[in-house]
């Protein structure tokens, strides 16, 4: 049995990506239902506050995510969402019979912005919670962030650089995110060590598009209209050749 906890950003900055997020999550969920083994799924949506839409449901019973649950609003209370979920799952495991505690627990956290609205938890408290669960119970935590330095932000609350990745927060990037998440979940559910290159496809997507942007900027700059000083320089450089260019005879 695997405990899966998804903590998904639905703050206002995610506007325009609702359909992509819903589609990506549902596609991942359907893929996981076809894999061997049982899993319990919890899904927490966060903005100003956290909303638990799936509380330890058997994987096969997880309904599709819809626009009724996933709509964007508010700010980014990331720490409250993460801290609250760890506290909830930790307490259940603490008081459950030993044989009822899942062998593996995995948290997947996605956000497109920095923490800016938590009231109950701070970085230090969440960091201590995460480090304790990793060291004592071998919980896995993945952090996928857009428009931020994901590795630096993850480190602030105890998630290593090898478990964090920057992604492009658009239609293509969001779809790829959930494909990669699904692959990582499959590894953990199968009791395989999570490969160091679990995030390779996301890294490659980001790098490829950054190169494309740089190339586009280069050509845009190269073909931009020359300034007066540039034009003067060009005229000076070609002036020695001008004498060699035949001219029409003047009219007398």
Regions found by a protein language model. Give the residues of each.
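Acidic, low-complexity, intrinsically disordered interaction modules
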Residues: 237-249
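A short, sequence-level motif marking secondary-structure junctions
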Residues: 59-61, 231-236
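N-terminal regions of proteins, emphasizing targeting and processing segments when present
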Residues: 206, 210, 222, 232-233, ...
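Acidic, low-complexity intrinsically disordered regions
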Residues: 1-214
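Short amphipathic, helix-prone segments within low-complexity/disordered or flexible regions
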Residues: 216, 220, 224-226, 231, ...
